[in-house]
Design a protein with these regions (language model features):
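A beta-strand signature from Gram-negative outer-membrane beta-barrel systems
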Residues: 121-164
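Face-selective signature of the C-terminal outer-membrane beta-barrel domain
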Residues: 230-236, 271-427, 450-452, 510-514, ...
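Gram-negative outer-membrane beta-barrel transporters
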Residues: 335-342, 405, 409, 514-518, ...
Length: 696
């Protein structure tokens, strides 16, 4: 059984199922391994092989639409990353991922302040992706409206080398190499397993000024030290250069969705480079006790040119139109698990999580003067220079109690403490010293009762409290155009109650969940313009909804997947300056989402599949006066798999947006100039070839 070490309190373990009735994956929201059916939380597991099936292997949006409660929107803008939200958490993000916790092989892809990204996830070497929703996600600490955990493949025998290539519309080309293997079976001292993957992605982009280039490498090396301990080394590197097409007004979108007028004018773009390494030590102390220690460190460099005119940048307090920042981050998570009895069987997990980030942030004008006129897209004079520190120390405890044969209790608590410290080194007339600091502390409890109605049907009731601090980026700009950090921004807190049901249907699993989340001091977009966004607290909000999911196997060759999400997310207090927004929908969140796919596949020979995706309209501003229309798109895939000796081959083709629907892929919430809309591409095509050679 393969185990995936997770970074925080829930510690899900992922393994191959032992029977078809247990589905293809088993997970746990507690320290012991149970099936997805028996997990007392809303959790979905996506298999890496399924993600790679007839796919470009570039974006998570290709394969996560089947997860209920998860809204994935592809901006078609590789300078800003995907837009992800779980039950509405993360919807305000104008770039990157916020409100969620993301982990890649136990290393946070979310910084201590809650800012995350998906750009370093290598789909080519993914083993599983686990999506946790609901109250238990709060046990991961700050900004955990939901949790996305990515686990890379563990190498096995025989050694295998794979090559893949995909070419599609808009000059899209993705190609890569991967080597996996093992020495020994992993149970004896000196046994080694390895996975090494590297790939490159280039595209001209669907829109003008949206070309991108991305180099990504991922490696995992495991060494069995002795019969009871193992050491795993993790390495990851990503290098991205991407143009930023920006948003469009409604008239611009209807006139020509491929245009990028401000991208061309300001030469907006973003360069990102990140390298990180991690080391995980696992030891079985006794038959009842296990120890796990995860250490990691990394560096991330970003340079971004924004579409800000010269006039605003001339104000003494303005930070300019170029962001230049370097981040160093590191952390350690130590946990001890004990299995025993206290009147009933119980499992206890206690741990301590420490994360630290140091950021050097500079701002420059995005122009130079040439013959008396501004030439945009060039780095000009320094306008900002500061050092920001952030760190957290979170002790946690989780317990699992088997009260009876049918009734179990999972309960946990985490005490999250987050500190910010900013030192301003750019002090000029009209721009004083804006140094400052802040700290936030919160108890985060969660609990769940699960009852087994039958061997194939479980129901559960769970509740929990979470909180979300402002990220450094959210603190970086004040809405009044003054200099310095926005320390008036407060953390938000939320309370969630959920009831759920999971039923095994032959070789399938049907899941359902009802939930309500009440939030105080919700952090929302105040204004957004030219790539710069300021934030404010919105008072009270409410999210309530329902999720349905079905994964059903028919015979040996047919498979149906379906998901439906209804989410009513509204403001309960006014957040608008000059109009009442009480009762308005929170922007960036679809009220209804639907997905269905049906496919036919054998181990060898032809395979084919189709999918349909639906998203209802999405409000673009707090006043609810602008929205992106609803849409439905259809995709088709087909391919042929065959083997020749020790070589496996897979040739495939796909078409997305089959009926050439014109729609908005994502919205920029509260964009001050009405440039809310980021268009999605029309009908597009791709072909690919995957080759694998086994050294047997």
């Amino acid at each position: 059984m393969r185990h995936a070490a997770l970074p925080a309190l829930l510690l899900p373990l992922i393994a191959a199922a032992q029977t078809a009735d247990e589905q293809t994956m088993v997970v746990t929201a507690a320290p012991t391994t149970v099936s997805e059916l028996d997990t007392p939380a809303a959790v979905s597991v996506v298999n890496g092989d399924e993600m790679r099936q007839a796919a470009p292997r570039v974006n998570l949006s290709e394969s996560l639409s089947a997860v209920p409660g998860l809204q994935v929107q592809n901006r078609q803008n590789y300078a800003q990353d995907l837009q992800l939200s779980i039950r509405g958490f993360g919807s305000r993000s104008t770039y990157g991922v916020r409100g969620l916790r993301i982990y890649v092989d136990g290393i946070p892809a979310t910084m201590p302040d809650g800012q995350g990204q998906t750009s370093n996830i290598d789909i080519g070497s993914v083993d599983t992706i686990e999506v946790l929703r609901g109250p238990f996600s709060a046990l991961y600490g700050n900004s955990s409206g939901g949790v996305i955990n990515v686990t890379s493949q563990t190498g096995t025998q025989p050694p295998t080398v794979e090559a893949s290539s995909y070419y599609g519309s808009f000059g899209t080309w993705h190609y890569g190499m991967k080597a996996t293997g093992a020495v020994g079976d992993g149970s004896h001292a000196g046994d080694v397993d390895y996975t090494v993957s590297t790939n490159r992605f280039t595209t001209h982009g669907y829109r003008d000024h949206s070309g991108a280039r991305k180099n990504l490498a991922n490696a995992r090396l495991g060494v069995r030290i002795n019969d009871v301990s193992k050491l795993t080394l993790l390495l990851n590197s990503v290098d991205i250069k991407a143009n930023d097409a920006g948003g469009l007004t409604a008239d611009e979108w209807r006139d020509n969705p491929r245009q990028s007028p401000r991208g061309d004018q300001y030469n907006t773009r973003k360069n990102t480079r990140q390298t990180q390494a991690g080391l995980r030590y696992e030891r079985q102390l006794s038959a009842q006790d296990d120890l796990s220690v995860m250490m990691y460190a990394g560096e991330r460099e970003t340079t971004q040119f924004q579409s800000i005119p010269r006039a605003p940048q001339l104000k003494p307090s303005h930070a300019g139109g170029v962001i230049d920042l370097t981040r160093h981050y590191q952390g350690i998570d130590t946990r001890l698990t004990h299995r025993g009895e206290l009147l009933v069987p119980v499992t206890l997990t206690a741990g301590l999580d420490y994360e630290n980030m140091s950021e050097r942030r500079k701002g420059y004008e995005n122009f130079v003067m040439v013959n008396g006129a501004p030439q945009y897209g060039e780095q000009g004079a320094l306008r900002r220079n500061e050092r920001n520190l952030m760190w957290n120390v979170d002790p946690y405890l989780q317990t699992q109690w088997q009260l009876t044969d049918k009734l179990s209790l999972d309960a946990g608590v985490r005490y999250s403490s987050v500190w910010f410290d900013s030192n301003d080194y750019y002090i000029t007339p009209g721009n004083g010293d804006d140094s400052g600091d802040a700290s936030y502390h919160k108890w985060l409890p969660a609990g769940s009762l699960k009852y087994a109605l039958t061997d194939a049907w479980n129901v559960y009731l769970s509740a929990g409290r979470g909180f979300e601090t402002p990220t450094i980026n959210e603190l970086s700009y004040r809405s009044d155009n003054q200099s310095g950090l926005n320390f008036g921004l407060k953390p938000s807190t939320n309370d969630t109650v959920e009831i759920g049901s999971k039923t095994r249907l032959g070789n399938g699993l049907l899941t359902a969940a009802l939930f309500q989340t009440n939030t105080d001091n919700e952090i929302v977009v105040d204004s957004s313009s030219g790539g710069r966004t300021s934030y404010k607290n919105a008072g009270k909000t409410r999210r309530q909804g329902m999720e349905l999911g079905l994964d059903q196997q028919f015979g040996e060759s047919w498979r149906l997947k379906a998901a439906w999400t209804w989410l009513d997310a509204t403001y309960r207090t006014n957040v608008c300056d000059d109009a009442s927004c009480n009762g308005n929908r929170i922007p960036g969140i679809a009220r209804n989402m639907g997905y269905a796919s049906f496919g036919y596949q054998l181990e060898q020979g032809w395979y084919a599949g189709s999918d349909i995706r639906y998203m209802s309209d999405i409000m673009a501003n707090d006043e609810n006066t602008a929205k992106a229309p609803s849409w439905t798109v259809v995709g088709l895939t087909t391919g042929y798999k065959w083997s020749y000796g020790r070589m496996d081959m897979d040739l495939f083709g796909r078409v997305d947006n089959l009926f050439d629907r014109e729609y908005v892929g994502s919205v920029i919430v509260n964009e001050s100039n009405g440039r809310y809309y980021e268009p999605a591409p029309g009908r597009n095509y791709g072909i690919g070839l995957n080759l694998a050679w086994r050294f047997e």
